């Protein structure tokens, strides 16, 4: 019979090393077998040479090489306070230490000198826990002296994340020019570009005699594209420091040409300033506004969707109920244009020319210059710093082909060339100096199989008949050089390639949808709400929230809206965040 006894029994005493160290510490305290004395200016600390050698490369090199200390019974440790050496020796023999604000700096220096890496990192962790916007800049300088990269990186991360508070600290104005430039060019900087400019001005004015020449280099670090044109051209362009610099005025003029001319190209020198958003500040968020919700009640709600938490946040309500207004955003400001204003009390309605604006900075609705012509059921589209209002229904209740353009720089509307054909509910998008109006319906509600193209710089229209276009009540959105037309009493999704002048079929939606909204965030198409035909061909309102990825040609559900909604606006707005965007 085979033996069942265990021939091999591996055993490891988990407590032996701890007990061994404990007993060695007792021997040290009783000065038994100690063979070396560490000397400071006012103290002598007996130790075991082999324990020191085993604990640190510094002592191993000292005692195991041909240094004179290898044969000495007494070793002087100059430049380290006695209480610090005592703490280090206690740490060597026990593995424990209490770090305080009074002790941390000399302890960190000693740990660095004596090559106790874990103790050094423990001190670094302690200092990282003390970080705040007021001391992070001094912590960065300290980390450079101590050569502590982990502390330096954490302190710099706080400096760019809490830039508003850091810029107000006393240490900020003492930064050198290279240090300030390093912060201002950081993609992680959590600040709006207006504040970036104001901060560099404050730094220069702290010592204007020696710093005013730095405006050339500092101004290049401001991402000018993300500054509102009014602030840029009325405040920044007129600042005496900016005007004193030829380079700054040349940059301002280049930006002016880019904003005012639809055909201007971005120069190589200006491109970093113009095209690159910061990872922290340029987080696009989805805003859903207006429309008709549950039981066709006109809604005053404005909602913001947080992709990270996947939750909806309520913004300030519209000042009044508007039926079939147009919605557009430009320079991170939401515009609600025109519409049919409704009174729930009297039941009266009036065609409106009013323009309301909402900024996420203030979360308050304001009025801008009203349109020249009241209209509703119209379309609005933005291009550069312009907003175009196209068609709709006017005060005479007739379908209009008129077009007007709003200049956000000067808060002015002007009449533009009318559309060749008046249509209702077309899909409209702007790309590459042109506005495209796809389909829609005529006064008799017949689909119009037509593409109308407006050349912005020439103020001229052209038209192209095509049987591919048959959309009504469908939104359009631009991703790269393709205009996506989504649904419109159909499940169909098609992409119009503006360069190749051809249509490409995409994956269909799940339902035949109309009166929905679509927008683009991070090169993905987000579709919200609308109405759809169910399996019994009955029209129902929808709270659907879906996303289309053109790279994979796949639709995914993002959940649902807080309520069923159609004839609303769906727009991307940029909000400031102190968390980075995912790579």
From Swiss-Prot:
SMART domains named among the record's database cross-references: BACK, BTB, Kelch
Keyword Coiled coil part of the UniProt annotation: no
Gene that this polypeptide is encoded by: klhl38
Keywords: Kelch repeat, Repeat
Gene Ontology molecular function, alphabetical: ubiquitin-like ligase-substrate adaptor activity
BTB domain span: 34-101
Domain BACK intervals: 136-237
A cellular component term, taken from the record's GO annotations: cytoplasm
The organism of origin for this protein: Danio rerio (Zebrafish)
Keyword Repressor set for record: no
Disulfide bond residue pairs: none
One GO term of the biological process aspect: proteasome-mediated ubiquitin-dependent protein catabolic process
Name of the molecule in the record: Kelch-like protein 38
């Amino acid at each position: 019979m085979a033996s069942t006894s265990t021939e091999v029994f591996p055993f490891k005493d988990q407590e032996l090393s701890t007990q061994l160290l404990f007993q060695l510490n007792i021997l040290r305290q009783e000065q038994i077998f100690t063979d070396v004395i560490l000397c400071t200016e006012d103290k002598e600390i007996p130790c075991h040479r082999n324990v020191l050698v085993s604990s640190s490369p510094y002592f191993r090199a000292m005692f195991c090489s041909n240094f004179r200390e290898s044969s000495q019974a007494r070793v002087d440790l100059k430049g380290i306070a006695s209480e610090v050496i005592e703490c280090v020796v206690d740490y060597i023999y026990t593995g424990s230490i209490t770090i305080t604000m009074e002790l941390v700096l000399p302890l960190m220096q000693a740990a660095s000198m004596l090559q106790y890496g874990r103790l050094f990192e423990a001190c670094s962790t302690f200092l990282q826990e003390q970080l705040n916007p007021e001391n992070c800049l001094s912590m960065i300088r300290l980390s450079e002296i101590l050569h502590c990269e982990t502390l330096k990186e954490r302190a710099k991360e706080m400096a760019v994340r809490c830039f508003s508070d850091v810029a107000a600290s006393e240490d900020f104005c003492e930064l050198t020019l290279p240090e300030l430039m390093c912060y201002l060019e950081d993609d992680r900087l959590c600040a709006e570009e207006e504040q970036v400019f104001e901060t560099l001005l404050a730094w220069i004015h702290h010592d204007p005699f020696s710093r005013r020449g730095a405006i050339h280099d500092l101004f290049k670090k401001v991402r000018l594209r993300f500054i509102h044109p009014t602030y840029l051209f009325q405040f920044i362009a007129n600042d005496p420091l900016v005007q004193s610099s030829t380079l700054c005025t040349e940059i301002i003029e280049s930006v002016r040409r880019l904003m005012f001319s639809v055909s201007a190209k971005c120069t190589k020198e200006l491109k970093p300033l113009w095209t690159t958003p910061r990872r922290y500040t340029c987080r696009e968020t989805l805003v859903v506004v207006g429309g008709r919700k549950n039981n066709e009640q006109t809604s005053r709600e404005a909602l913001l969707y947080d992709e990270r938490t996947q939750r909806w946040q309520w913004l300030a309500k519209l000042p009044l109920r508007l039926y079939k207004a147009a919605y557009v955003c430009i320079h991170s400001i939401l515009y609600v244009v025109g519409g049919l204003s409704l009174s729930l009390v009297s039941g009266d309605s009036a065609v409106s020319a009013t323009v309301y604006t909402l900024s996420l900075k203030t979360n308050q609705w304001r009025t801008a210059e009203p349109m020249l012509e009241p209209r509703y059921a119209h379309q609005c589209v933005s291009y550069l710093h312009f907003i175009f209002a196209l068609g709709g229904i006017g005060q005479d209740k007739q379908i209009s082909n008129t077009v007007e353009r709003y200049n956000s720089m000067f808060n002015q509307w002007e009449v533009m060339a009318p559309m060749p054909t008046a249509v209702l509910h077309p899909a409209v998008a702007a790309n590459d100096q042109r506005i495209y109006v796809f389909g829609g319906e005529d006064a008799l509600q017949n689909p119009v199989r037509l593409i109308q193209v407006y050349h912005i710089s020439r103020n001229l229209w052209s038209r192209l008949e095509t049987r591919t276009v048959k959309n009504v009540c469908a939104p359009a959105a631009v991703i790269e050089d393709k205009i996506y037309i989504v649904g419109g009493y159909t499940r169909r999704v098609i992409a119009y390639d503006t360069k190749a002048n051809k249509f490409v079929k995409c994956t269909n939606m799940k339902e035949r949808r109309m009166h929905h909204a679509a927008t683009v965030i991070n090169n993905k198409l987000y579709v919200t709400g609308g109405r759809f035909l169910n399996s019994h061909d009955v029209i129902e309102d929808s709270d659907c929230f879906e996303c289309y990825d053109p790279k994979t040609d796949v639709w995914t559900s993002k959940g649902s809206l807080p309520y069923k909604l159609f004839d609303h606006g769906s727009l991307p707005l940029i909000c400031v965040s102190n968390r980075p965007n995912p790579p």
